[in-house]
Amino acid sequence: MNKIKNLKNSTILYLSLIILLSLTFTFYSGYRGIFPIDSFLIFDAGFKILNGYQPFKDYWSITGPFLDYFQYLFFKMFGVNWTSYVLHAGTINIILSLTTFYFFLNIGLKKIHSCIYSISIAILGYPSVGTPFMDHHATIFSLLSLMTLILALKKDYYYYWFSLPLLLGFSFFSKQIPSAYLSILFLITILIYLAIKKFRKISNVIYLFYGFVSLILICSSIIIINDIPIKNILTQYIFYPISIGKERSLYLNFNFNNIFSQFKFIYFSLLPLIFPIYYLIKIKVKKYQNLIDILILFTFLLSVIIFLYSQLMTKNQILIFFIIPFCLGMTHYYIINYCKNKKLIFLLLFLIIISTLKFHIRFNIDKKFMELSGVDFSLAQPGQILDQK
């Protein structure tokens, strides 16, 4: 009885710590400098909806209607002020961090390790920008959808299948990529999964369809209630971004720095996977769980490639370094299940500490994502000079 009580208390302690750090780092970053266009983009959109304007109908919108409506809700509940704006980002950061903790616990990592990876994500996730931003929302919800798919493949619970289309939809309506690419990959993964199960137990996958229908109903309700023309949505959110994407893809620079150097810590986090992959290949008679783990491994690695490609397509500062803790956590899972080398676990923990410190300094303190590197923050003026809110 005391053991159960201690377990509950330790879980509550971990969850409280993750929530506290998720909010603290986001608020620290959100109040540390602004970049006029990017910092106020979603603020303005949420304020427009609060005043009766609708995206696509009353103002041009090529990215982020999900953010616009979500920010509207925060303004409605907490008032039009910077605190409710940063709280929006902090809330998403909490969701990401807590889901990461839950995910790693459910695939078999210890609480302390799950907590370490979750805290790292809490520090490197939304704090890199500090205020709501479409690229962060899109990448975060895409990462959440990847976690959900992995849990669905391992646990086969209906609520994971149901949630998957919703999370992909939230990501897509934050920004079109990476969810558009991930949807294709996930569909292929699900078909292979069904083939492994010989199409016998597909009842839970039906909930995937229910989730998709629910997403369609939510979107349709918003469109009908607000009388938003479908033609405007297609023009602004589908056709125009496709034309931009085609042009950008033609001029992508696949040099060493773009492909390898700037993402080296992501590759470092994946490098130890060589050992469990070797052991997986050596297994002559692969059991059902081995096949599922192989499927998850390839889906995970291809998803990382999609995240990298999407980052290159944004032509923006790098934001995906918060997938490093996730990559290390996945590597951790395969090591303890197929390699069982404690030295490699210490290597992973060393990498998580180094990468978290490095990118916390670069993005949260120096604010590189907001183009504020080298700025003397001692000369900063309080925002109340412009507006008390």
What does each of the following model-derived ranges do?
Residues T100-L124:
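Transmembrane-helix signature of polytopic, membrane-embedded enzymes
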Residues Y160-P178, L182-L187, L301-L312:
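Membrane-interface alpha helices of multi-pass inner-membrane proteins
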Residues K264-D293, L297-F300, V304, G329-Y334:
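Hydrophobic, aromatic-rich transmembrane alpha-helices
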Residues L13-L21, F199-I225, I266, K342-S355:
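Hydrophobic alpha-helical membrane-interfacial segments at the cytosolic entry of transmembrane helices
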Residues N106-G108, S145-F162, S171, F199, ...:
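Membrane-interface transmembrane helices that cradle and orient dolichyl/undecaprenyl
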Residues G30-A45, F56-Q71, V80-T83, I228:
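Extracytoplasmic catalytic/substrate-binding loops of multi-pass membrane glycan-assembly enzymes
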Residues A138-K155, Y160-G169, L187-L194, F326-M330:
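Specific aromatic-rich, kink-prone transmembrane helix
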Residues G130-A138:
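Short acidic/glycine- and proline-prone juxtamembrane loop motifs at membrane-interface regions
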